[in-house]
A protein has these predicted regions:
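DNA major-groove recognition helix of helix-turn-helix/homeodomain DNA-binding modules
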Residues: 26, 45-60
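A detector for short, charged/polar N-terminal pre-domain segments
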Residues: 1-5, 69-71
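Conserved hydrophobic/aromatic packing and binding residues within compact polymer-binding modules
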Residues: 7, 21-22, 32-35, 61
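Recognition helix of helix-turn-helix/homeodomain-like DNA-binding domains
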Residues: 25-41
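Short basic helix-loop element that most often maps to the first helix and adjoining turn
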Residues: 5-24, 49
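Short, charged recognition helix plus adjacent turn
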Residues: 62-81
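DNA major-groove recognition helix of helix-turn-helix
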Residues: 36, 54, 65
């Protein structure tokens, strides 16, 4: 799944409008709609803001994993041993 679908799904799953998310990001609803359609690439600052807003990892939004939250650092270190 690509980030276009993920950002739409996250927004819809939390019952937010495009306008609400656009206001949070400090952009227009029109521009945010373009992100959701894939007509414009989303700036990294907006990706980071959405990760914080939805409490998910960038890897999840970008489609690299289906795990929404990153592993706690204590678990990452225990797997390296």
């Amino acid at each position: 799944m690509n980030y276009v679908q993920r950002i739409r799904d996250l927004r819809e799953d939390t019952d937010h409008t495009q306008t609400q998310i656009a206001e949070f990001l400090g952009t227009s609803q029109t521009m945010y709609a373009r992100y959701e359609r894939g007509a414009n690439e989303m700036p990294i600052r907006h990706l980071i803001a959405l990760c914080q807003y939805y409490q998910v990892s960038a890897d999840y939004i970008l489609g690299f994993t289906d795990v929404k939250k990153p592993l706690p650092s204590s678990e990452i270190y225990s797997h390296k041993k």
